[in-house]
Amino acid sequence: MHIGQFQLTNRLIAAPMAGISDRPFRALCHAMGAGMTVSEMLSSNPEVWRSDKSRLRMVHSDEPGIRAVQIAGCDPDEMAAARRINADSGAQIIDINMGCPAKKVNRKMAGSALLQYPDLVKQILSTVVKAVDVPVTLKIRTGWAPEHRNCVEIAKLAEDCGIQALTIHGRTRACLFNGFAEYDSIRAVKQAVSIPIIANGDITDPHKARAVLDYTGADALMIGRAAQGRPWIFREIQHYLDTGELLAPLPLVEVKRLLIEHIRELHDFYGPGKGFRIARKHVSWYLQEHAPNDQFRRTFNAIEDASEQLEALKAYFENLA
């Protein structure tokens, strides 16, 4: 699959997830088989561009693979300026967020709130596409509410504005992450436009990935929550798509290696004062299968030193062996 001039190595994309898809996580997903990774959402508000938080979220020219960054906002000119700044920093693809269901984002008329205003969507997309010569993609939901699904209308509008690929999460904003993703709307969009369509939502294992591709006709899949604590899901899915066979479960020794490497990278990236806090949620996800009683996770979350975290993890896995 191509996005503009860029050819993905496969049809699997790591989703932009706020507070999760940082540089260490993106690098790990890339190493585990993602054909592309997308940065966590960056605000287009110029007042926060120079903050440490925004700086850490930006992609840079030395990152592996295709460098894609997601931006959010509602002001067309600010969005265009954010596109230019990120392109200058090394972004090769700009993704526009019109799918985030978070209240704090929607209150600012950003994310999925924009789906209620097709005229503003058109203005934003047209302005951003014209701002810099890098491909622009769009991520949406199926609509604002089940009774107001307008993803086909938005998709046609996006194609007319020059959007190079469209990701659709199979829920409306009102659904948040409740219930199940529905794929009829994604299928309808695929049949209505000619740009690449990326299906997103509840793609949790290789069998589901194959089924969603077959049913929707989507060109690619975007995987988010299922990769939390399980970044090797990309490798598992790709192997199944290629061969029709499932990989054996990842050996515990390999889980240990990946987890400790990931936590080390988080400590280095954020610094010892913040890295240990960021690490806690990732460790919880990794160990959901291996620490079902939560006792170790509760103990781990009380640790406030990076080196002690690493020692605790090593001891934990030694006890499991």
Swiss-Prot record:
PROSITE patterns: UPF0034
GO molecular function: flavin adenine dinucleotide binding; FMN binding; tRNA binding; tRNA dihydrouridine synthase activity
Enzyme Commission number(s) from the entry: 1.3.1.-
Residues at which FMN binds: P16, M17, A18, Q70, K139, N200, G201, D202, G224, R225
Residue positions of the active site: C100 (proton donor)
Catalytic reaction(s) noted: a 5,6-dihydrouridine in tRNA + NAD(+) = a uridine in tRNA + NADH + H(+); a 5,6-dihydrouridine in tRNA + NADP(+) = a uridine in tRNA + NADPH + H(+)
One Pfam family in the UniProt entry: Dus
SUPFAM superfamilies: FMN-linked oxidoreductases
Keyword tags: Flavoprotein, FMN, NADP, Oxidoreductase, RNA-binding, tRNA processing, tRNA-binding
Cofactor: FMN
Function: Catalyzes the synthesis of 5,6-dihydrouridine (D), a modified base found in the D-loop of most tRNAs, via the reduction of the C5-C6 double bond in target uridines.
Cross-referenced HAMAP family: DusB_subfam
NCBIfam families (alphabetical): nifR3_yhdG
Similarity remark: Belongs to the Dus family. DusB subfamily.
Record-given protein name: tRNA-dihydrouridine synthase B
Species name: Pectobacterium carotovorum
